[in-house]
Amino acid sequence: NKYYKTNEVTWVDEAQMFKIIDRAETIEPLMIGSKAPNLVLRDTSNFIHNLYAINKDLTMLIFYDPDCGHCKEVVSDVKQNYDEWLNNGISIEVIAICVELDRDKWIEFINNYDTGDWINVAEFKTYVDGEFNRQNDPYVTPFPYVKQIYDINGTPKIYLLDKDKNILVNSIKGNIGVDQLSEIVENESKE
């Protein structure tokens, strides 16, 4: 990023340079070791959850679309591992963030994949005719902003955070398998 911003790169045209710099600025706050941006979203009971208020050694964020086949597979695998982690005394919270703005599909997904013991959040209330209305719900993170700050351009996307909400894993579309993710969770819980 520093070379592109200082015009030290001469082989890229201006339009491409803008795209490269813009992309670098988007992903920079999501690098491993960075503090994850806060999320404040509502669950199925309309209760507000604040990411920074979660008091667990590990927090896993799973961004998913209920119509995504790979999301279904990943959520099912994580759920199986989650139950084992809890049985082994691992202090972890899973926050499942639905990116599809269809409440019925969201609820059906939670029921079908038995994720009721996770924090299941999405944001529907703040939309009026497809537009975000801050006056409707001033307490939550606007969903287009959530997708932007977490760089959600495909699903599933998983972040694993430590107790201070620093990013340990940033995985898009399963580039880290659930087995590897489980190994990281188990290793981090021993530290």
PLM region spans:
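Short, small/polar residue-rich loop motifs at catalytic or cofactor-binding pockets
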Residues: K35, D57, N153-T155
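Thiol/disulfide oxidoreductase modules built on the thioredoxin-like
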Residues: V128-E186
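Extended hydrophobic-aromatic, low-complexity segments
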Residues: N50-L51, L61, G69-V74, R103-I107, ...
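Short active-site neighborhood of thiol/selenol oxidoreductases, capturing the structured segment around
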Residues: F47-V78, E93-I95
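Oxidative protein folding and maturation machinery
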Residues: N1-H49
